[in-house]
């Protein structure tokens, strides 16, 4: 782009216009992008203790058998610290490392996996029950549970936090441990945006058969699905794709044709073909950065944090707006305050029922609110000490709310 401006001695064309006019993606460039992405993906195995109750041959009696169980999924290398002693952060789905059926009392007082291992592409192995060669019997650990051998290429991963309501979990490993397996391992690149019709490439571990690639398109930018991960049904905002996904793809990366991450694949529709889902990049980035930030700050709740504004919103005048200059369009809507809770942050900012929120200013940077979920996405990025202010339309006038400085006491843990 810089060379183009120098050659033409012109600044009239924007970078996005330059891309749309002069940069095209062929099958070859997409293949090259996928090849690079293979340095940033992992397959995951999570180990739990589960207990099953069996009926005894004696009437009215039963007995319980406890043993290890393995679940598999996928992940992406999200952030690598190359400094000595640094950590690499890895993102997957919460449901890849959480098992509702786990025996909490025997699984380390948690339903999060007691052990998590990852494998880089090209260095993959499959865990197997350890066998005592001399007796030809399965080895047991100190608790009497089946012991698994994960192989030399397995990388031990530590769970540092997650959000069941976003279906995102963050793991970490010493960067040196990852580079010892593959010195070329790299973190993913994040896309700036994604659009309906855009190429959607999934890289994951379908059916635990090893890392593989499928390709489709983005069908719907923002859809809602219901998932039951921990015994409670929740609604999840998702990207709908027609890219083929299978069990084991969960937690894997969804990439565009340029090889940049646009989401984390997490669900499929078993009854309908070509309808699958991914956690949108805004949520992936918001939750992951949030968890990493507060983990490094010493917060020990293993979760993300947010503020509660104390508002209920409604939307109106939703429409699709096409930009001929960029060649892209988006759905836009008016976000109207339906109610403001007493003694809330919103009330202290002097927001009122009927206000139309058009933007939120964070530390002097203005962020447009074009959809209702833009508010919750932005809230994930807020940190203690940030100063926020709302821009609203009130009685056909543009009004700036009072400023509010986020305190530590305003933060609440996200499920």
Over which residues does each language-model region extend?
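Active-site loop architecture of trypsin-fold serine endopeptidases
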Residues: 94-113, 178-185, 203-216, 225-251, ...
